[in-house]
């Protein structure tokens, strides 16, 4: 180990303070997904996980109800447009273009949002990187360390409230059954969320 381990046991939680004071409100990005954490959407291929990610991204970027209101608001606060970055390793730009139009014509049209306002909000708040046919963005080095690609990803996602890597399998070359490698990958991704 090249650097000394930080003593993670030097500052236990202040139980007295916690008991005597109300806890802060939890900051949810999506229901069940706290800010600065990592979550997974898992399922077999071709069940529309990417379309779900696009719909979530569009809703957050425009401040419109998530999935047309099927998913309730969080903490009763009004929704505001938020920056979202989608990194789609298996999607070509033309496919994303088709899907954006499909979502705009159904999801946003049903909410009666002005199309020009929606376009402006999406242009400002939604970053999509369609990487099909591009070089792999490998976030896990040979010794499970961070990579230069991870630093580029972190910079591309600065200020984003939600970042989606789809599918996560395309962002590393490790054996997904290797728990050490997957733990390192999860820690790297979590560090980008800070």
Regions found by a protein language model. Give the residues of each.
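Conserved inter-motif catalytic segment of the P-loop NTP-binding fold
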Residues: 16, 75-176
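Substrate-engagement module of ASCE P-loop NTPases
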Residues: 152, 156, 182-194
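The Walker A/P-loop phosphate-binding site
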Residues: 3-105
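Glycine-rich loops and low-complexity Gly/Arg-rich segments
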Residues: 66-67, 109-114, 187-191
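A conditional alpha-helix N-cap/helix-loop micro-motif detector
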Residues: 23, 143-146, 182
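Helical "lid/switch" subdomain of P-loop NTPase nucleotide-binding domains
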Residues: 167, 178-185
């Amino acid at each position: 180990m090249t650097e000394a381990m930080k003593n993670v046991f030097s500052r236990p939680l202040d139980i007295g303070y916690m008991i005597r004071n109300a806890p802060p409100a939890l900051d949810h990005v999506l229901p069940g997904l706290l800010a600065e954490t990592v979550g997974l959407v898992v399922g077999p291929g071709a069940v529309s996980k990417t379309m779900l990610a696009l719909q979530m991204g569009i809703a957050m970027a425009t401040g419109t109800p998530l999935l047309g209101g099927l998913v309730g608001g969080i903490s009763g606060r009004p929704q505001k447009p938020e920056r979202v970055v989608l990194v789609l390793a298996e999607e070509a730009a033309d496919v994303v273009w088709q899907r954006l139009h499909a979502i705009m014509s159904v999801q946003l049209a049903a909410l009666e949002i002005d199309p020009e306002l929606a376009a402006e909000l999406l242009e400002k708040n939604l970053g999509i990187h369609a990487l099909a046919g591009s070089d792999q963005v490998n976030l896990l080095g040979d010794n499970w360390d961070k990579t230069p690609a991870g630093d580029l990803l972190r910079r591309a996602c600065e200020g984003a409230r939600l970042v989606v890597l789809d599918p996560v399998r395309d962002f590393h070359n490790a054996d997904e059954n290797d728990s050490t490698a997957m733990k390192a990958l999860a820690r790297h991704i979590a560090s980008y969320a800070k």
